[in-house]
Amino acid sequence: MNKVLLAIAAFALVAAAVPSYAQQATTKDQLIGSWKVLSLKATTGDRVSYPLGEQVSGYVTITPTRFWLLFVDATRKAPAAPALTDAEAVAMMRTQVAWTGKYTTAEQTAEGIKLTARVDAASSQAIFDTDRVYFIRFDGNKMMVKSPSVIVPMTGATSIVEFELVKAD
């Protein structure tokens, strides 16, 4: 009887030590590629907002050394004329964000692999020459990205930013 209990306990320990598919560590190689954004939200305290609206459109492309991001509000209207009015230009800046920078990856945490990108070109000077830190993990075919706290260029607020992506064709 004791041997059976010992065998069951040993099996349970081994089974618990083997990570499931969903818990496997994220690797840098998994990040490489172009990803289509599915959602983007920002949380400040207990307030959740959608800085580019609830119908965001855009892509993130990750190469072995560089991170590119371009998001726009999918519901924004085209300007009436090729030359933007001042009001249209201001509105356009509030409905998009784009930046790029070299990045490094660090340790795997419970939240995912840590990625730190140094912004060297951006649509907003508020984020130029800053570090953007994200934790990235996978849930099936989706890449989930979450920041501990970054400046949201469209609002200027410091928020926890989360976006969900799927591999682009």
Predicted features by range, described:
Residues 1-4:
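Positively charged n-region of N-terminal signal peptides that target proteins for export
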Residues 7-16:
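Bacterial N-terminal signal peptides
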Residues 20-169:
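Lipid interaction determinants
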